[in-house]
Amino acid sequence: DGTLVEWDLTSLEDGDPGTRLPFLIADRTPRERRVQPTGDLATSPIRGIDTVVLGVPDLTTAVDAFTTAFDAQEPTRTTCADLHADVASFPDLPVVIADPTEDGWLAERVSRTGTLPVAYLIGCERGADHGFENLTTGSIADRSVEWLPVTHPVGHRYLGLVAEQ
């Protein structure tokens, strides 16, 4: 329709943007020109991406990178049975870092691709009826996750619903 949209984009490190550290984007488009949710989307209990789970080959190196880049608080470190990984979650960042502890899909993926997102946790209003079926319950970083039945293209569930914090 000819409407001009603009944004600023920057990377925090060399290499492909958004692999280990996220790229930063600032939308300069006036809000009135941006897409607005309508219909069912306007009243949906789904709020958007809450947390990105990043698979890494070395937890300490990744934690140090995030702490330095974002002046982040010390993360909570736990083990995650769902991922077969040691994980670190920051109280002030929307990311969980996962370092595989045994063979499995996460170890294979990190070995093959290096540091990349491996799961996305979608924020949902606490107690709301989101309307999804065939969910599998699990947890990551001591947060309850309801995994959606989406497995394509990676062969396992990677989209999860979490109650907004």
Give the ranges of each region predicted by the language model.
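Glyoxalase I/VOC metalloenzyme domain signal
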Residues: 1-76, 81-165
